[in-house]
Amino acid sequence: MTDDRTNGAPAPGDGHGARRPAVVLANLGTPSAPTPSHVRRFLREFLSDRRVVETHPLLWRPVLEAIILRVRPRASAAKYATIWRPGEETSRSGSPLMHYSQRQGELLQEELGESVQVRVAMRYGQPALRRVMGELMEAGCHRIALIPLYPQYAASSAGTVVDEAARFILASRNQPELRTIRSFETAPAYIEALATALEQHWQSHGRPDPAAGERLLLSFHSIP
């Protein structure tokens, strides 16, 4: 017998006509506060993922618990504090990653309209991906498009998001219809959006001056 909230009796909106589609924008995640304890909790979940660190747990766990989680949280918390958005606990304060992810979700909701439910989820931390998928199922959203917010595919980024969604499905008696996007780095619309954002920034702040040593720097999050 399974034990998730969508099991047992049919979920609301179980009829085909009431099944509202949903889009889930999945990002990596963030500590809920810039403190050592919250950073430690986030790092433990993140660095315990076999997609992120492929070393066998028997070898990796002692290193993680005895060294990394004793040393890294305090230093990382201090760095998080320098970029943390001030204010009360709202979607506009706190982690920049959370703020801009939620804003992206709001803008997509405006674009798609009320016929589609748009939610933001995090692979690590909150709002947890499996929790968000469960809430959508309870709301009658049985067709879910899952979009990992990583243009290029990597097992440790987009791959682990799909893993987590699969774990939700494996534990669910009432399963959703799920579609995922592997990557979109070559999509013309994505490239055009980057170019448009860059052009708008230049119009507001001026173009780089090569003679003054100014350059346009493109930064990518690398993996081993």
Where are these regions (language model features)?
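Active-site-proximal alpha-helix that buttresses catalytic centers in soluble enzyme cores
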Residues: 2-224
